[in-house]
């Protein structure tokens, strides 16, 4: 029995010994595993250049720098994306739209002409060079941010003169009128053979042409058709407009002085004429006894007309028959426009009294001098469906020469400053159902005209006078919402005398550096301006057709002054040679 017990005890001791060594082995293996893992982690961290806790302080700064780099990269990429979007979504469709508009204008013109050919009135297809597609009759400079007067005219550029000049000392060329459509331009002026003061006989020069680009890239005006209306008729105060059928012209016919005409009892004879693309001219008398039944004198505004909604629109003015319905409806109506930062010191009641009297100047026998707008349907029949709009004198000043302009989708009426208000005026105009509505005007305080006292260039109070000179502004710079910001024009930079023609860009209060024709003593008169763009080069040009003193051959020579519109912040003046 003792042996059996000893055997059992021995087996137990052996089992315990095995368990002990097994435990020691397991502990050793676990220890080695932990050590190996620690060494591996340390090696890995070392190989990766891991930071110690003390190094972790700079991590937020590094993250911020990395974030800035990423943001900058994304920003530059966004600029590229924005440019791509602007090109693809905005500029390309606009360019296509401009091209489409020009093509549609040409097709419309052709359709009119083909219909005319069917009626034996001849037809042709003049059109500007492709370089000008989308650059005529458009908002040429769209800029919300730049100072308007940072744009300025270059020195006058040499180009082909498309305007005939007098050929004798007694010859006189006066009263230029110009209009340009997407397909062609029209120009006219009056020619008097025996001095500019002769009112009894004259002839009218009328021309149709297109814009071309020379092989060296220069702009020039190419006359395709022209005619001298040298007959027994005495056309005066003519306005011209480029329409799908050619050059439509509105003229009055008179053999008496303006003062005598205003003292007569019947309206002035008026004709609607057209120079077709075939070079033939036709005209038709308007029924002035019906159209101007309340008027004693009526004249076109001299400035160009505009083709809008299948009709041609002209500015007209003249004298109303006292106590006629048209005269009575204007009784007591007036408007006072004020100079920028230079208000009239007179008592308000006195200003109102003078403003009312300004519509009835003594020079024309106390007749009310009224502004109006005439629209005529454009068809192969001349003088078709004429409609006269007489705006209220709560908007317009005393009637005067003027011009209808269309730029983009906006229409304007320029009114010469013949009354007391010297700064240039552009009335926004809307058309509907053959009639026009004028709205409160844009005024350009630095774009003044000379005038006799008390209505000189610096005048600031209402007064009764007939003075000034025709110097129209052309809408040049717009906000993106199509609101007008600035204009180009050639003013006469004098206080009372018609001297010193100077071209500039104007905003509502100031002007850019100017380009002078010559010294301040040079005599000048009417100016009319039109701007356009050579789309191929993205260069904007402005043409000012100006009456400049020409003592050797006639009193005036009509000169087409061409400038390029430049941009910078300088204030120097440019002068033509």
UniProtKB/Swiss-Prot annotation:
TM spans (from-to): 27-47
Principal location listed in the UniProt entry: virion
Domain of life from the UniProt record: Viruses
Region (Important for interaction with fusion/F protein) residue spans: 124-152
Disulfide bonds: none
All ranges on the Virion surface side of the membrane: 48-577
Glycosylation (residues): 341, 433, 481, 538
Stored Pfam families: HN
InterPro entries, per the entry: Hemagglutn-neuramid, Hemagglutn/HN, Sialidase_sf
Any one of the GO CC terms: viral envelope
Molecular functions (GO terms): exo-alpha-sialidase activity; host cell surface receptor binding
Stretches in topological domain Intravirion: 1-26
Key words of the record: Glycoprotein, Hemagglutinin, Host cell membrane, Host membrane, Host-virus interaction, Hydrolase, Membrane, Signal-anchor, Transmembrane, Transmembrane helix, Viral attachment to host cell, Viral envelope protein, Virion, Virus entry into host cell
Reaction catalyzed: Hydrolysis of alpha-(2->3)-, alpha-(2->6)-, alpha-(2->8)- glycosidic linkages of terminal sialic acid residues in oligosaccharides, glycoproteins, glycolipids, colominic acid and synthetic substrates
CDD domains: HN
A biological process term (GO) from this entry: symbiont entry into host cell
Catalytic activity, EC: 3.2.1.18
Membrane topology type: Single-pass type II membrane protein
Outcome reported for the amino acid change (mutating residue 140 to A): About 80% loss of the fusion promotion activities
Localization per record: Virion membrane; Host cell membrane
Effect caused by changing residue 97 to T: About 95% loss of the fusion promotion activities
Impact when changing residue 526 to Q: About 30% to 50% loss of the fusion promotion activities
Domain notes: The C-terminus (head domain) is involved in binding the cellular receptor.
Task of the protein: Mediates the viral entry into the host cell together with fusion/F protein. Attaches the virus to sialic acid-containing cell receptors and thereby initiates infection. Binding of HN protein to the receptor induces a conformational change that allows the F protein to trigger virion/cell membranes fusion. Neuraminidase activity ensures the efficient spread of the virus by dissociating the mature virions from the neuraminic acid containing glycoproteins.
Family: Belongs to the paramyxoviruses hemagglutinin-neuraminidase family.
Protein name per Swiss-Prot or TrEMBL: Hemagglutinin-neuraminidase
């Amino acid at each position: 029995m003792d042996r059996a017990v000893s055997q059992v005890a021995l087996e137990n001791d052996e089992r315990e010994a095995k368990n002990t060594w097994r435990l020691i082995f397991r502990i050793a293996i676990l220890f080695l595993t932990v050590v190996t893992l620690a060494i591996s982690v340390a090696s890995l961290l070392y190989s990766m250049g891991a930071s110690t806790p003390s190094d972790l302080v700079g991590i937020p700064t590094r993250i911020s720098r990395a974030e800035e780099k990423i943001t900058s990269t994304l920003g530059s990429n966004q600029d590229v994306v924005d440019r791509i979007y602007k090109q693809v979504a905005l500029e390309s469709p606009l360019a296509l739209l401009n091209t489409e508009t020009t093509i549609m204008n040409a097709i419309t013109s052709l359709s009119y002409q083909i219909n005319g050919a069917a009626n034996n009135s001849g037809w042709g297809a003049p059109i500007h060079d492709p370089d000008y597609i989308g650059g005529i009759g458009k908002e040429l400079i769209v800029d919300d941010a730049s100072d308007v007067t940072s744009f300025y005219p270059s020195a006058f550029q040499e180009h082909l003169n498309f305007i005939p000049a007098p050929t004798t000392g007694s010859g006189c060329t006066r009263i230029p009128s110009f209009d340009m459509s997407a397909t062609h331009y029209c120009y006219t002026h009056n020619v008097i053979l025996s001095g500019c003061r002769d009112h009894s006989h004259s002839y009218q020069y009328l021309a149709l042409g297109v814009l071309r680009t020379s092989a060296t890239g220069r702009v020039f005006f190419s006359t395709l058709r022209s005619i001298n209306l040298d007959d027994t008729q005495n056309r005066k105060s003519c306005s011209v407009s480029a329409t799908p059928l050619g050059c439509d012209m509105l003229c009055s016919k008179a053999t008496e002085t303006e003062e005598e005409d205003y003292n007569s009892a019947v309206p002035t004879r008026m004709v609607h004429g057209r120079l077709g693309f075939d070079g033939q001219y036709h005209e038709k008398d308007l029924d002035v006894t019906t159209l101007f039944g309340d008027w004693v004198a009526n004249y076109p505004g001299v400035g160009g007309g505009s083709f809008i909604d299948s009709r041609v629109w002209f500015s007209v003015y003249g004298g109303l028959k006292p106590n006629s319905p048209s005269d009575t409806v204007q009784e007591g109506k007036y408007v006072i426009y004020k100079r920028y930062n230079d208000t009239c010191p007179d008592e308000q009641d006195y200003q109102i009294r003078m403003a009312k009297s300004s519509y009835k100047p003594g020079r024309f026998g106390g007749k009310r001098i009224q502004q109006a707008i005439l629209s005529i349907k454009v068809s192969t029949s001349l003088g078709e469906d004429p409609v006269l709009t007489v705006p209220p004198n709560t908007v317009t000043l005393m009637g005067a020469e003027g011009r209808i302009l269309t730029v983009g989708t906006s229409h304007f009426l320029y009114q010469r400053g013949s009354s007391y208000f010297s700064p240039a005026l552009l009335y926004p105009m809307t058309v509907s159902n053959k009639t026009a509505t004028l709205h409160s005007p844009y005024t350009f305080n630095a774009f003044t005209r000379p005038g006799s006292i008390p209505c000189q260039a610096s005048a600031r109070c209402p007064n009764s006078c007939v003075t000034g000179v025709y110097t129209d502004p052309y809408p040049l710079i717009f906000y993106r919402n199509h609101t007008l910001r600035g204009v180009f024009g050639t003013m006469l930079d004098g206080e009372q005398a018609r001297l010193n023609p100077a071209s500039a860009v104007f905003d509502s209060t100031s002007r850019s550096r100017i380009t002078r024709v010559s010294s301040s003593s040079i005599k000048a008169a009417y100016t009319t301006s039109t701007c356009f763009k050579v789309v191929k080069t993205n260069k904007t040009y402005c043409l000012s057709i100006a009456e400049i003193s020409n003592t050797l051959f006639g009193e005036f020579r009509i000169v087409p002054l061409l400038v390029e519109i430049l941009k910078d912040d300088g204030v120097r003046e440019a002068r033509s040679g």
